[in-house]
Amino acid sequence: MKWAYKEENNFEKRRAEGDKIRRKYPDRIPVIVEKAPKSKLHDLDKKKYLVPSDLTVGQFYFLIRKRIQLRPEDALFFFVNNVIPQTMTTMGQLYQDHHEEDLFLYIAYSDESVYGGEVEKKE
């Protein structure tokens, strides 16, 4: 997926910001959330989030659902490196497993499993 945040900010700028955030808020996770291509959902009002590391993916789903004003019956999928993360995974664990070199975690959201995403399995 092409990330607008990456296109708008070069690697050095993103890395410096990611590093600054992680030093200042070591118990929080810097997350970039963008709509997947072909998704019919609304755009978020902001892309960048700073979330507690003990927040679960399920709780983050709830937060994003509210921000895009989804009805309870509307589907919402997250993708991290083309994988659908489990809802009980903490954002800290997801970050540890999937953050990029710029120290941000990138999450795409969609109203359908557009990537044919696989559910992440716990070992």
Curated annotation (Swiss-Prot):
InterPro entries in the cross-refs: Atg8-like, Ubiquitin-like_domsf
Residues linked to a lipid group, Phosphatidylethanolamine amidated glycine type: 116
UniProt membrane topology term: Lipid-anchor
Residues the UniProt record annotates as site (Required for interaction with sqst-1): 28
CDD domains documented for this protein: Ubl_ATG8_GABARAP_like
Pfam families membership: ATG8 (PF02991)
Effect of residue 108 to V: Does not rescue the degradation defect in the lgg-1 bp500 mutant
Modification after translation (UniProt): Cleaved by atg-4.1 and/or atg-4.2, after Gly-116 to form a thioester bond with 'Cys-523' of atg-7 (E1-like activating enzyme) before being transferred to 'Cys-255' of atg-3 (E2 conjugating enzyme), in order to be amidated with phosphatidylethanolamine. This lipid modification anchors lgg-1 to membranes and can be reversed by atg-4.2, releasing soluble lgg-1. C-terminal cleavage is essential for autophagosome initiation and biogenesis. Lipidation is not essential for autophagy or development but the lipidated form is involved in cargo recognition and autophagosome biogenesis.
Protein localization: Preautophagosomal structure; Cytoplasmic vesicle, Autophagosome; Cytoplasmic vesicle, Autophagosome membrane; Lysosome lumen
Name of the protein: Protein lgg-1
Annotated organism of origin: Caenorhabditis elegans
Encoding gene, per UniProt annotation: lgg-1
